[in-house]
Structures are given as structure tokens and as C-alpha cells.
């Protein structure tokens, strides 16, 4: 069984590293622009501070972010955490 964590703020990065140390396998970072931290910045910091945890958005809202910007964001995270990233797409704000 896998366990994951959801976070939204860059100052909660300690939760992500603690969750990895406890054996959590995934981290989803919400993409709520203007409300929470930039998801790509949080994921980049998490990529630097974790070694095994899979990292991605939960969820990226296509109607609020241009596709090339989202593609560049996840590609950058993949460079920092090769093979450990994913992108969740959806309507968000639920």
C-alpha cells in the first residue's frame, strides 16, 4: 500500500521530507494560483530535498495555465527528480 501527502505552501517543505522519512511514496502539490505558493517552486524545492518520493501536481488546471508553461514546469521538475515526477490534470478548486 502506498501513502501520499498533499501540500500547498513552500514553508511546509519540512512536511514533505518528514513524510518521505516515514515511507510515504507520493507528494501532490496543489496549483491554486494567487492563494497558495507556486506549485513549480514547491516541487523544485521538494525535488532537491527528497530522494525517493514521487512528486507532482494535484491538480494542474489547464484553463488557468498555458500548456507550454505547465509542460516546461514539469519538464524542469523531471530534470531535478528524474523519473519521479507526474502531472495531475483536472478542474481543480474542489
Across the structure, where does each feature detected by a protein language model lie?
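Generic, well-ordered alpha-helical segments
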Residues: 34-38, 62-69
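Flexible, glycine-rich active-site loops centered on histidine and acidic residues
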Residues: 1-5, 64-94
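N-terminal beta1-alpha1-beta2 module of alpha/beta enzyme domains
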Residues: 1-58
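Short glycine-rich, polar/acidic loop-and-turn segments at beta strand-coil junctions
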Residues: 31-33, 59-63, 91-93
Amino acid at each position: 500500500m502506498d501513502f501520499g501527502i498533499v501540500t500547498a505552501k513552500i514553508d511546509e517543505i519540512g512536511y514533505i521530507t518528514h513524510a518521505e522519512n516515514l515511507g510515504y511514496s507520493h507528494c501532490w502539490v496543489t496549483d491554486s494560483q494567487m492563494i497558495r505558493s507556486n506549485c513549480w517552486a514547491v516541487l523544485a524545492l521538494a525535488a532537491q530535498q527528497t530522494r525517493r518520493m514521487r512528486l507532482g501536481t494535484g491538480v494542474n488546471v489547464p484553463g488557468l495555465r498555458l500548456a507550454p508553461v505547465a509542460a516546461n514546469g514539469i519538464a524542469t521538475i523531471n530534470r531535478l527528480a528524474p523519473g519521479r515526477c507526474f502531472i495531475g490534470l483536472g478542474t481543480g478548486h474542489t
